[in-house]
Amino acid sequence: MSADASTNSNASLDEKNLNITSEAEIKNEDVTAEPVLSTVLSPNGKIVYISDKVDEAMKLAEEAKEIEVTPEEDRKLRWKIDYCMFPLMCILYAVQFMDKISTSSAAVMGLRTDLKMHGDQYSWVTSAFYFGYLFMNLGPVQFIFQRTSHMSKMLAVFIVIWGMLLALHAAPTVKYPSFIVLRVLLGCAESVVTPCFTIITAQYWKTEEQFTRVSIWFGMNGLGSILINAIAYGVYIHQDSYAIKGWRTLFVITGVITIFIGILIFLWIPDDPSKARFLSKREKLMVVQRIRSNQQGFGNHEIKKYQIIEALKDVRTWLYFLFTVSSNIPNGGISSFMSILLNSDFGYSSKETLLMGLPTGAVELVGCPLFGILAVYAANKKIPFWKYKLSWAIFAAVLALIASCMLGFATNSKKARLAGAYLWYISPVSFICVLSNISANSSGYSKKWTVSSINLVAYAAANLAGPQTFIAKQAPKYHGAKVAMVVCYAVMIVLLSILLIVNLRENKRRDKIAAERGFPEETENLEFSDLTDFENPNFRYTL
């Protein structure tokens, strides 16, 4: 290549503000075979080619660019989205948790006796659910839901199916083997809710709003716990009035409720903001404008292999994975065995156990949203350390560690152990923070789905293993399970601290690079180009 050609090449690149000094650097990049709309320089110094396979929000981006949204309009739109989307989302999340832990209440209502369970067989009832959950998140969930343009409709179908499966738990012909099969299938059906909700949250709310929203809908697990204990108590005290056993009646009731909620989801929740019947044309454009700062849009229905590979190479993916394993081994055990602990370890009767389970849900229902609100307040006030959401996750993990120690080692005080059991229900705050991190910090639709799926594989595997820490021969104290909880929460604190440091350092590095590059001409609608967080120079990680 001649010197003149080299000079011309460099000049053309400088005109694009790419800060590339030689044509060789372009040749080192993998140029896509797809039509190239534009190029951008990633934070790692690589040229990124933007193809025509962009985010769904790009269809509205040009039109949205022309409108101006006042702070008052933005506030009203946010409240409208909250009002129209959130109640049904919260109810569904409460119902899915109610269904998931229904076996815990059924266990003290005669389930174990009627199905002739012995030894560790009850532990496998819970683990079976997570075998199905694990299988679906190994790939099927991502393939089905990323490829479809009707995400909420597909979600509704899965909800109705799991409602039917739950009602089938009550069939008089169900024995232990068939009950296990039903639990596996139920896990398959329920596995879709959390990843779908993570995507929906990113579609409608800004990154700074997402932690509070995830805290609220995930905190509805507490409402689900209250509902299942209340329904179970009502069934238990009137069980002589039914033609079938009380625990079978419980599954029929919860199954019918779930089917009804699935129908409502199908009729009301839109597939993405552009299809929301409760939003006017202008409001749909306003949604596009308000999520520009997220550096991501509604999603892309093509599965991009390079984004999957990037997700596998991202250290955050594996920090999420290890954290989720650590946080959900205790969760898998306590969710299934809390009623049994109250009954056998604390000495409450079956009737008292169902009542004593109510406060556990109240702690989670109030505590999780409260942490989300406090985190937003601290961020707005820029309070050192506490302005980071991950700081609140670390604090919640410390509380969970204290609660586990109280539950496991306060052997001389029943009240202290009971207080620890209740305080433990604040522990989901840490997991909520990680879910909101995945929603906000994993950019690129295929990458987001991949990271979410890997995280939920860890969730399923840990919840599958959790009940196995409750060894039958250690009943009623289950000392080994309590020690495992303490170890897991100690590991969680370390992992969350590492995640915070990694994101802080990367944001500082990107700020430094941006300052050195100056202010190049902005690539139009870059945030809706379906770029990953590794590719987008404007992306900063939520802390």
From Swiss-Prot:
Q: Where in the cell is it found?
A: Membrane
Extracellular side: which ranges? 98-123, 172-178, 238-248, 343-352, 412-417, 473-482
Q: Which SUPFAM superfamilies match?
A: MFS general substrate transporter (SSF103473)
Keywords from the named record: Membrane, Transmembrane, Transmembrane helix, Transport
Q: Which InterPro entries has this protein been placed in?
A: MFS, MFS_trans_sf
Topology in the membrane?
Multi-pass membrane protein
Protein name per the record? Allantoate permease
